[in-house]
Amino acid sequence: MAITTTMSFRAQAKNLAEAKRKTHLRKNMNTYYVYIMSNKRNTVLYVGVTNDIERRVAEHKNHLLPGFTARYNVDKCVYVEDCGSIEDAIAREKQLKGWSRAKKFDLIAKFNPDMKDLSEE
């Protein structure tokens, strides 16, 4: 049986702390997205946030989740913006939700003037 010295306990604690720090940083390096969905006639806008844009858009398109987007047939992704953290994404989502329809359409027009479904490109 090996005897562990105080020094090796400190080294182990340091290594554990470093591993936890790296894991925490990896979690913070995830990309989060703020997106805007619309319907075929572009009469409805829905603003949302996700960490998996492909999955989330597929959920909207296939009406897998009951609610606003299923009720109003929102199935076209017209705007996507990536954010560095979930906090930034939620703050941006709230900001966009507070905007008028006209301001949201202006934002979309800067990046997607034809209101194409970005998930099909």
Question: What would you call each of these model-derived segments?
Answer:
Residues S100:
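Arg/Lys-rich, alpha-helical DNA-contact motif
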Residues A2-K94, L107, F111-D114, L118-E121:
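GIY-YIG nuclease catalytic motif and its immediate N-terminal context
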